[in-house]
UniProtKB/Swiss-Prot annotation:
Pfam family of the protein (one): Ribosomal_L19
Family membership: Belongs to the bacterial ribosomal protein bL19 family.
GO biological processes: translation
SUPFAM superfamilies: Translation proteins SH3-like domain (SSF50104)
Protein name: Large ribosomal subunit protein bL19
Name of the coding gene: rplS
Function: This protein is located at the 30S-50S ribosomal subunit interface and may play a role in the structure and function of the aminoacyl-tRNA binding site.
Top-level lineage group: Bacteria
GO cellular component: cytosolic large ribosomal subunit
Length: 117
């Protein structure tokens, strides 16, 4: 058996938190811990997941939000110790796994349909 895979699996078991299952197109809120000097605060980052990449302990996801008509994207590692929690707000209905086309759309065209449950 590959030694690197064994180490990654043990590391993932130690650092893995229970987050809800989400995919591209879902709207999530990430509570991210930010340290400024000797103070620490939690910032809520709400947006649409446009990409899931990697696997295992190196898995990461990209969240896009609109801030005053400017698109802001942020990449979060799934096993980051700075992520406090992740809340799934909406389940999106999309046919692609990478939603790069949202970068070109403006206004109501950039909305994603919500999946009915």
């Amino acid at each position: 058996m590959d030694l690197i895979k064994v180490v990654e699996q043990r590391f993932a078991d130690l650092t893995q938190k229970a987050y809800p299952h989400f995919k591209s197109g879902d709207t999530i809120t990430v509570a991210y811990r930010i340290k400024e000097g000797n103070k620490e605060r939690i910032q809520q980052y709400r947006g649409v997941v446009i990409k899931m990449a990697g696997h295992g302990s190196s898995k990461r996801f990209t969240v896009r939000k609109m801030s005053e008509n400017i698109g802001v994207e942020r990449i979060f590692p799934i096993n980051s110790p700075f992520i406090d929690n992740i809340v799934l707000n909406k389940i999106g209905k999309v046919r692609r796994s990478k939603l790069y086309y949202l970068r070109k759309l403006i206004g109501k065209k950039s909305r994603i349909k919500e999946k009915r449950i």
